[in-house]
Amino acid sequence: MSNDPSAVSELPDKDSLDNGISNDNERAMGGNGDGGDGLRLPRTTGTLNVNALQKGTNAAHEAGGYKSMDPAKNAETTNDDDNNVVSLDDPIQFTRVSSSSVISGMSSSMSPHSNIDETKSLEAVTPNINTSNITPDHSADNTFSTINASESDHQFNDTLLSKLSLTDSTETIENNATVKHQQPVASSTVNSNKSSTDIRRATPVSTPVISKPSMTTTPRQINSASHSLSNPKHKQHKPKVKPSKPEAKSKPVSVKKSFPSKNPLKNSSPPKKQTEKSYYSSSSKKRKSGSNSGTLRMKDVFTSFVQNIKRNSQDDKRASSSSNNSSSSSITTALRISTPYNAKHIHHVGVDSKTGEYTGLPEEWEKLLTSSGISKREQQQNMQAVMDIVKFYQDVTETNGEDKMFKTFNTTTGLPGSPQVSTPPANSFNKFPPSTSDSHNYGSRTGTPMSNHVMSPTLNTDSSSANGKFIPSRPAPKPPSSASASAPIIKSPVMNSAANVSPLKQTHAPTTPNRTSPNRSSISRNATLKKEEQPLPPIPPTKSKTSPIISTAHTPQQVAQSPKAPAQETVTTPTSKPAQARSLSKELNEKKREERERRKKQLYAKLNEICSDGDPSTKYANLVKIGQGASGGVYTAYEIGTNVSVAIKQMNLEKQPKKELIINEILVMKGSKHPNIVNFIDSYVLKGDLWVIMEYMEGGSLTDVVTHCILTEGQIGAVCRETLSGLEFLHSKGVLHRDIKSDNILLSMEGDIKLTDFGFCAQINELNLKRTTMVGTPYWMAPEVVSRKEYGPKVDIWSLGIMIIEMIEGEPPYLNETPLRALYLIATNGTPKLKEPENLSSSLKKFLDWCLCVEPEDRASATELLHDEYITEIAEANSSLAPLVKLARLKKVAENMDADEDNDDDNDNEHINKTNNCDDNNDSKETVNLDVTEDDKQK
């Protein structure tokens, strides 16, 4: 050690340097920082494995991928954390270590004898010595140099601790040797990369090198070196113990230090943590030599324990961060407006390009087609017709009575500026008693004027409805939710002006009584408006706009009642979606139930107004059931006091799907009287049953005459004339019957003919059952109805033509076909063919062809047909039908008697068979008893 005074004078103050370094050592090694006693520890010998330098250098550079176990810290603190882990490997190293006490930890844990033994063992292993780059003058500062270069490598692995310490020491030695002959400067930068290159050049890889005892430091030299740091002149050059931030891939860090001109090793400022590295370099040799194996094993266990704790904490932090990210992303996803989900395309009907057949038809449609008798060839020839009739068949069979009300009567458009009348179901309807089967509307949706000769002048109070009454139209689909979400339509001034002729007390707008036909239109209009007040189910597109957030479309009334509901619904998360859906469905069902109850109360209230009070059984006597209609039984009775025959139709209101339609029928019939329409007498409500008293036609229906008698052309003309007269009246009121057939044409004993909305079904046979198997009786339907096209009042003219064929041949065309095949034949065949057309006169043929034109535009109207030659010249008087009515009635009575006798005979035969069976059983029992008695006697 040189005693150059200049060098000593330039060294920094020892106390100030040790205070800064000891504080860092306390944080890293658990010291208490209460003094510098560690500086006075005795020195011990040290060795340097030069062979390990090169391997350690390579391993240190290859360990660049190591990452910090603590994600909360930056990458630049990795080296400090790793050193902290290493320091825990030896509990003895928890003493204060200053920059001058190089091997104080070693001296405190091992005696000089153990160090000497270790040195001897190392010398025995590697006797070759290479001192080409090491001089005895520098031997006292080798360990300081090791500390100096330790900061150049900030990433290392625990398995390379011993090699790293030696490598750093050698790098610093070479570095010091390089700057030895330089001029003294205030600060010089030392790059450990260059030093690493120099040491590799100086030390061959193939030569194992280990230091001689000359490399060891004595306690005296260490104390001298420690004392050399006490000069306060170089306080401004006090080295920073904090490691600089490493660059990418752990590049060595340049450390600025001050070196004297002659002995640069004196000014080597040892950073913290190198003492532990130098110690572990020797402890790794001890593992190889087998000394202190128990202590090392405990150290290994403790080290692995600490590292596992670090890893677990790192995994927990990563898991928590990932869970936080996932939760935040889930919240973001919950608040994001999604696209439609769970969409299903159940059926896709296509056409095979080769065969031309439909592919992908629903199973129900396939069954209908196969059971209907429509062959594959027919399906291929008229594919679109098949599709239309299948849809129509399903609509007719699945529709309810309330929807039928919209299909029965005509539609009139409101004023253009009315937002409440945006769809046809929101329009007014004129109604008259239809039949028990379906009937369709033919009203206007465009408001185009028609000829005025079919209109009643009293209907001009509503110009828009009068002008566009007879434009052919189909019932439009149900209005969207926007219609139901609007304000109550019945209170709008536009609808008030349209309904200003209603005499009812239920109308919410001011009304002007009128005894003419406008009463019917206003009555039906009010019922239609009440229909619109029903809450509609939510439309799916409004849901998908905020999915998966549950929200519903509210009407203004609902929003006013619960203004906080939308805000609560928009905060929902996908996890609460099923609960929200269930609650929403429950609310909708509850609202529907309340609406049904409300409408039921309104229905009974309205019935009580239009019906008479009292018990009908006290006013009518001798009730005899003569038929069973679709909506109730039909009875005949005599009015007490006058002895007039009446027909009573009894209906259970709870079982009626079309209660509103029944009310409108009663109201229309009350205000309408026509000689060719069955007149309404009175109505009663008794114990939940509606009793409708009507004019009784004792001759029965035209069906009895057709099935039992043969009509002449004159008699057929009489029936056509009376029927057309009634249709003209209905059409003038904006009503179409849509179910004209022989069952709904009633006759009196004098031959008078009247239209009715129900048919007598006293004749129970196969033919009559076929007529009533399907609501709407497709055999009399017009092609435009079957093909789902727009239609108007001329559908009744087509039905009249089919009824003419029925009167000629005894049955309508296609009666023996299934209803679906009959619809197919009507749609594809057009005008049906007669069996014997040559037997008809030219006037009847012309009249029939005019009635059965496929195109509605070419078909005649009721007024035009009334002026036809066949009606004016060939048709006979009504009295000509009286003999046919009497004959048909006699035959019908005879059939009923025969049927009763057959039933009695069948009952007698069954009784005789049962008696014979009983006698046979008794005989067998007696025989068995006799046999048993004889056996007993023998015994």
UniProtKB/Swiss-Prot annotation:
Biased composition (Polar residues): 44-57, 176-196, 204-231, 408-467, 500-527, 569-578
Modified residues (N-acetylserine): S2
Catalytic activity: L-seryl-[protein] + ATP = O-phospho-L-seryl-[protein] + ADP + H(+); L-threonyl-[protein] + ATP = O-phospho-L-threonyl-[protein] + ADP + H(+)
Biased composition (Acidic residues): 899-908
Modified how: Autophosphorylated and phosphorylated by the CLN2-CDC28 complex in a cell cycle dependent manner. Autophosphorylated on serine residues.
EC number: 2.7.11.1
Function summary: MAP4K component of the MAPK pathway required for the mating pheromone response, haploid invasive growth and diploid pseudohyphal development. Links the pheromone response G-protein beta gamma subunits to downstream signaling components. Needed for mating in haploid cells, induction of a mating-specific gene FUS1, induction of mating-specific morphologies, and pheromone-induced proliferation arrest. Required for the regulation of the actin polarization and bud emergence during cell cycle in G1. Involved in the high osmolarity glycerol (HOG) response.
This protein's name: Serine/threonine-protein kinase STE20
